Amino acid sequence: MAAATASLSSTLLAPCSSKQPQPQQQHQHQQLKCKSFSGLRPLKLNISSNNSSSSLSMSSARRSMTCRAELSPSLVISLSTGLSLFLGRFVFFNFQRENMAKQVPEQNGMSHFEAGDTRAKEYVSLLKSNDPVGFNIVDVLAWGSIGHIVAYYILATASNGYDPSFF
């Protein structure tokens, strides 16, 4: 029993195999010859040789009538990250810098460094960049992580059948 369970579980996780099954497992392997996954849901692919022509015509008719869009994860993550980096650099950059300037600590209208605190000096070489407006590595990491979060949200909601229907 343990050997049958082990071979069945390896069959479920492995791609289609052309090995001949043992005689006592012949019935199980005819039903589950190939197993594919759509997200976390298993898809059973039954391959039967006795009525292949009727099943092919039926499956081709079904395939032609349904249109299913699946999202490519790498494409979604790349586009979402690129879009968020673009928005961070060209749209929200000035707004972000103005809000950061308002939050700098001050004493008597001067920054702590200008008031004489030498340890309050920023570590400048980390934030240096060759970008004309000063988009640095911290901005890239922040906006890139926002893009990844949005992409994973899109992929998670699309894989479980969630349809927001905004319009």
UniProtKB/Swiss-Prot annotation:
TM helices/strands, residue ranges: 75-95, 137-157
Biological function: Not yet known.
GO annotation terms (biological process): photosynthesis
Topological type in the membrane: Multi-pass membrane protein
Key words of the record: Chloroplast, Membrane, Photosynthesis, Photosystem I, Plastid, Thylakoid, Transit peptide, Transmembrane, Transmembrane helix
Residue range of the transit peptide in the UniProt record, numbered on this chain: 1-69
Family, as annotated: Belongs to the PsaG/PsaK family.
Matching PANTHER family: PHOTOSYSTEM I REACTION CENTER SUBUNIT V, CHLOROPLASTIC, PHOTOSYSTEM I REACTION CENTER SUBUNIT V, CHLOROPLASTIC-RELATED
Keyword Heme attributed: no
Predominant place of localization: plastid
Region annotation (Disordered) ranges: 1-32
Residue stretches of biased makeup (Low complexity): 1-31
Gene Ontology cellular-component terms listed: chloroplast thylakoid membrane; photosystem I
Protein name according to UniProt: Photosystem I reaction center subunit V, chloroplastic
Subcellular location: Plastid, Chloroplast thylakoid membrane
